[in-house]
């Protein structure tokens, strides 16, 4: 639904009466540098614990040209961790600058309904177990990899996008050592699964020694535009990420 360069760059279960203990998520903050057809951008991402089982995942990106800020994108996902599963509560996306767009989702798990609004439109979407938003699914990927690091299986997620629920699938394609501004980092590479006729490509690399934090992302869209995002620095659980020994 998001057709801007910024969105291309950056772009689980019902509550119950009793809950088992969930494994806490590790807080982190990270900065990224990005590029797309000569357009430079800087990004920040952080995961913050806001309550006993509550978290906020934030993502921002500022694009500039010749030192002038052109646009800013902000994403925020507030979710709870229930029975070790991600339960989204609210999601927001805003784009300001040369282009403007907004998207918000409110999850009502008691009523099994989500209210999704995009610019001037709004929709009611029935909820079922496993549905998440366009930002918290990235935490779901990391949790899945932490639980099971066998290479070769496919990860599947149901994500609200505008007025519908889409299925996103990622295939684990092996491990790679990447050279980054931090130094060499060992990563697992994921490829988004698409139809054979779809020319779009999405590849992401996650640090195996650092809770599968996002290290790099590359996207190629139908028009041939290539977008790249790379980790510049990060602190995970109070520890600064370092290169391989």
Residue ranges and their predicted role:
Residues 14, 124-131, 162-164, 199-200:
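Short, exposed beta-strand "edge-strand" segments with a Pro/Gly-rich flavor and a Y/T-containing core
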Residues 1-4:
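Positively charged n-region of N-terminal signal peptides that target proteins for export
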Residues 21-109, 147-245:
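Acidic, serine/threonine-rich low-complexity disordered tracts
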Residues 100-146:
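Hydrophobic, well-structured mid-protein blocks that either form specific transmembrane helices
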Residues 7-13:
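Bacterial N-terminal signal peptides
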């Amino acid at each position: 639904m998001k057709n801007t360069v910024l969105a291309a760059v950056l772009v689980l279960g019902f509550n119950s009466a009793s809950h088992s203990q969930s494994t806490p998520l590790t807080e982190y903050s990270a900065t990224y540098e990005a590029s797309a057809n000569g357009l430079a951008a800087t990004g920040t991402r952080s995961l913050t614990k806001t309550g006993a089982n509550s978290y906020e995942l934030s993502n921002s990106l500022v694009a500039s040209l010749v030192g002038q800020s052109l646009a800013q994108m902000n994403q925020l996902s507030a979710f709870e961790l229930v029975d070790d599963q991600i339960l989204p509560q609210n999601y927001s996306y805003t784009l300001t600058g040369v282009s403007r767009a907004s998207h918000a989702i409110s999850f009502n798990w008691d009523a099994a309904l989500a209210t999704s609004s995009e610019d001037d439109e709004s929709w009611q979407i029935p909820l079922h177990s496993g549905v998440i938003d366009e930002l918290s699914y990235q935490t779901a990927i990391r949790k899945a990899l932490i639980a099971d690091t066998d290479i070769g299986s496919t990860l599947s997620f149901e994500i609200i996008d505008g007025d519908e629920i889409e299925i996103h699938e990622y295939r684990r394609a092996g491990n790679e050592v990447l050279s980054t501004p931090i130094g060499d980092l060992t990563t697992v590479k994921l490829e988004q699964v698409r139809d054979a006729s779809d020319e779009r490509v999405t590849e992401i690399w996650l640090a195996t020694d650092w809770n599968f934090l996002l290290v790099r992302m590359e996207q190629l869209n139908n028009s041939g535009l290539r977008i790249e995002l790379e980790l510049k620095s990060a602190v995970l659980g109070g520890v600064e990420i370092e290169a391989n020994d």
